[in-house]
């Protein structure tokens, strides 16, 4: 991709946008910056980093009318808006940081493991990265997991990696056309971001863009959307919690298997829950696809301790166990967390629902939940969607109130689970802040 002397507008000035500005300027592009709401202190801060950088704010159309060749979008900005559609129709190109990285790794020959899905993608990305490092590969872990890919590339000063392990969101995949992963997975599809996509099929089609090229596909045999993503002529590795597959769970023995070969007992996996058994199978399949030995992978799986805020036990009070799954920001994630826990539950739900339908939680909660505590702006919708299913639902003004009320109703061996099925920004700075408040409320009991 030729960037020299191209006139490029970078839209969105978070970490990804800043990394794109740095990369594009280094490669000779004429770069300007845009943000819909641009505070003077932010202009000053970024201006100190990039001498002579021109800033635009207000309407995106007005900025684009200045003769730009390329619009480089941060993932939080949808390209499905009239101003951007008109820009493309007039010959402009729209891309993001993943497309820029794809150009780099394609030229250099770096291997890429790419991971997406509605739920589990951060856990699988972390596990795959951990396994690659433990097996001796020079590994870069980047993308939606936290470090922007071009920032990671900048830190490496152009040095080729043995493997890039990329967590990719649907937002990042929207304008990615050239990425050709060595191995890739869509872990699952459930309702998420339906405030951005036309419907669930539209969302699934965007996720499936991760399978461009001819690399190994790792697919969830239990998910109808994932089954439909199989590409003709491609090597596919299937994983399943329900029936025999390339990688599968033998329920009677509680062991993961590869075909007929025994792999590992679920009790030897530090990660809790059946959904994490699926995550381990996907991770091992991805790592094998880049040539890592199975025996070493399984040994290292036993030492991976997982991530904070993902079905994480934070403590026990008078026999009542408190579990933090603040990262459960959609219905599918919360349903998986509930399915993976055995004891009776009191579940804290609510926040910003992102246009989801919460009725699938009726089946997930049935027979397991003793009570539900609702918080946040979309608590009324959750109550409507769950109404009539026989659950005792309590509205709480704060997360602290929900923790106190749940604890007052719980008995020894019960679980109080924070798994909101919603984003957090109506009440908190993010899911990590929500987790901190939950933990402090537990400590205050």
UniProtKB/Swiss-Prot annotation:
Superkingdom of the source species: Bacteria
Signal peptide: none
GO MF: ATP binding; UDP-N-acetylmuramoylalanine-D-glutamate ligase activity
Cysteines paired by S-S bonds: none
Catalyzed reactions per annotation: UDP-N-acetyl-alpha-D-muramoyl-L-alanine + D-glutamate + ATP = UDP-N-acetyl-alpha-D-muramoyl-L-alanyl-D-glutamate + ADP + phosphate + H(+)
Record's subcellular location: Cytoplasm
BP GO terms, sorted: cell division; cell wall organization; peptidoglycan biosynthetic process; regulation of cell shape
Keyword Chaperone on entry: no
Documented EC number(s): 6.3.2.9
Record-level GO cellular component terms: cytoplasm
Purpose: Cell wall formation. Catalyzes the addition of glutamate to the nucleotide precursor UDP-N-acetylmuramoyl-L-alanine (UMA).
Similarity field: Belongs to the MurCDEF family.
Protein name (database record): UDP-N-acetylmuramoylalanine--D-glutamate ligase
Organism encoding this protein: Neisseria meningitidis serogroup C / serotype 2a (strain ATCC 700532 / DSM 15464 / FAM18)
Phylogenetic placement of the source organism: Bacteria, Pseudomonadati, Pseudomonadota, Betaproteobacteria, Neisseriales
Gene: murD
């Amino acid at each position: 991709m030729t960037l020299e002397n191209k006139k490029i507008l970078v839209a969105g000035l978070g970490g990804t946008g800043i990394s794109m500005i740095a990369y594009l300027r280094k490669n000779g592009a004429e770069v300007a910056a845009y943000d819909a709401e641009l505070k003077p202190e932010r202009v000053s801060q970024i201006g100190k980093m990039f001498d002579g950088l021109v800033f635009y704010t207000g309407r995106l159309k007005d900025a684009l009318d200045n003769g730009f060749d390329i619009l480089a979008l941060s993932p939080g900005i949808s390209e499905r808006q009239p101003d951007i559609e008109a820009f493309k129709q007039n010959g402009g190109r729209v891309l993001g940081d993943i497309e820029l990285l794809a150009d780099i790794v394609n030229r250099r020959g770096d291997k890429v493991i790419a991971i997406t899905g509605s739920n589990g993608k951060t856990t699988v990305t972390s596990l795959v990265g951990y396994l690659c490092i433990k097996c001796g590969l020079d590994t870069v872990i980047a993308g939606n997991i936290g470090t922007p890919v071009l920032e990671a590339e900048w830190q490496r000063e152009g040095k080729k990696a043995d493997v890039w392990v990329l967590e990719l969101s649907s937002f990042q995949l929207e304008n990615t056309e050239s990425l050709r992963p060595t191995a890739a997975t869509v872990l699952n599809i459930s309702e998420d971001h339906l405030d951005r996509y036309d419907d669930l099929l539209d969302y699934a089609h965007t996720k499936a863009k991760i399978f461009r090229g001819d690399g190994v596909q790792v697919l969830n045999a239990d998910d109808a959307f994932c089954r439909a993503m199989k590409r003709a002529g491609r090597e596919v590795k299937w994983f399943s919690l329900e029936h025999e597959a390339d990688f599968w769970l033998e329920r009677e023995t509680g062991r993961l298997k590869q075909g007929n070969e025994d792999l590992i007992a679920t009790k030897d996996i530090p990660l809790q829950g059946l959904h994490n058994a699926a995550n381990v199978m996907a991770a091992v399949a991805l790592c094998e696809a880049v040539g890592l030995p199975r025996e070493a992978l399984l040994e290292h799986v036993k030492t991976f301790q997982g991530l904070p805020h993902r079905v994480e036990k934070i403590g026990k009070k008078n026999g009542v166990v408190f579990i933090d799954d603040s990262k459960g920001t959609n219905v599918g994630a919360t349903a998986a967390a509930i399915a993976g826990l055995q004891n009776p539950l009191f579940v804290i739900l609510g926040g910003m629902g992102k246009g989801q339908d919460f009725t699938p939680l009726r089946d997930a909660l049935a027979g397991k939940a003793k009570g539900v505590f609702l918080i946040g702006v979309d608590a009324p919708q959750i109550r409507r969607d769950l109404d009539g299913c026989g659950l005792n639902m309590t509205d709480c003004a704060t997360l602290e109130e929900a923790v106190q009320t749940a604890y007052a109703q719980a008995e020894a061996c019960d679980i109080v689970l924070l798994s909101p099925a919603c984003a957090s920004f109506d009440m908190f700075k993010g899911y990590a802040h929500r987790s901190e408040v939950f933990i402090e409320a537990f400590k205050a009991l």
